[in-house]
Design a protein with these regions (language model features):
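Interdomain "pre-motor" coupling segment immediately N-terminal to P-loop NTPase/helicase cores
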Residues: 1-34
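Dynamic helix-loop-helix/coil hinge segments at AAA+ ATPase domain boundaries and subdomain interfaces
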Residues: 31-54, 106
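Non-catalytic interaction surface on structured domains
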Residues: 40, 50-54, 72, 84, ...
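Conserved post-Walker A coupling segment in P-loop NTPases
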Residues: 42, 58-122, 132-148
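Alpha-helical transmission elements in cytosolic ATPase-linked domains
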Residues: 52, 83, 111, 154-157, ...
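Structural signature of beta-strand start/N-cap positions in the alpha/beta core
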Residues: 66, 94, 154, 176-178
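Conserved Walker
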Residues: 89, 119-131, 144, 148-151, ...
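Structural recognition of the conserved hydrophobic beta-strand(s) that form the central parallel beta-sheet
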Residues: 97, 140-141, 157, 177-183
Length: 186
């Protein structure tokens, strides 16, 4: 069982914030991008560190676990998340990404969970959120560290219960989504 081998239900990647590492990460990003356009079984790495990361990422992709990627801006966190999705059993389902820092706080929950018609002033029709759009696939939450704490709490409930309510809704919506979260914060 790969999940037991990897030690649990959450896997964390960390990219160091050092000039040497950043320089190497440029090469790593290129290798990851190349691997995304190559056949599913191939992996490309130019050095042993990149090869080890790709090898671990491939194992992680086979386990249906939540993934947390931590590292500075520009180190390839989204590219790595796409690599994990592409090599997972969810690869034929949607990969949906959202930058949590770019969404106004008052709109974040409606974008993540959707909303019912009339739940707020401009809600003229029911709308599905990112969780529903990613159902069966992967939801990439970029800059999750910038998400307000109350939204993080609601997100934790979705991870625990595998269901949520749309804003203004009273019926739970079941969801099967793999979360890959990333941040530049420690």
């Amino acid at each position: 069982n790969i999940e037991k081998h990897l030690g649990g239900s959450l896997i964390r990647f960390y990219f160091k914030d050092e000039p040497y590492e950043i320089k190497n990460n440029e090469h790593f990003q290129l290798q990851l991008l190349l691997s995304l356009i190559q056949p599913k079984d191939s992996m490309t790495a130019g050095d042993s560190n990149s090869h080890q990361l790709l090898k671990l990422s491939k194992k992680v992709s086979e386990a249906d676990v939540t993934v947390f990627i931590n590292g500075p801006t520009g180190t390839g966190k989204e590219v790595l998340s796409r690599f994990i999705h592409k090599n997972s059993r969810r690869s034929e389902k949607p990969f949906v990404g959202i930058n949590c820092a770019a969404i106004p706080e008052n709109m974040l929950e409606a974008i993540l969970f959707g909303h019912e018609k009339g739940s707020f002033t401009s809600a003229h029709k029911q709308k599905s959120g990112k969780f529903e759009q990613a159902n069966g696939g992967t939801l990439f939450l970029d800059e999750i560290g910038d998400m307000p704490l109350d939204s993080q709490t609601r997100l934790l409930r979705v991870l625990s219960n595998k269901e949520f309510y749309r804003v203004g809704g009273d019926k739970p919506i079941k969801v099967d989504v793999r979360i890959i979260a990333a941040t530049h914060q420690n």
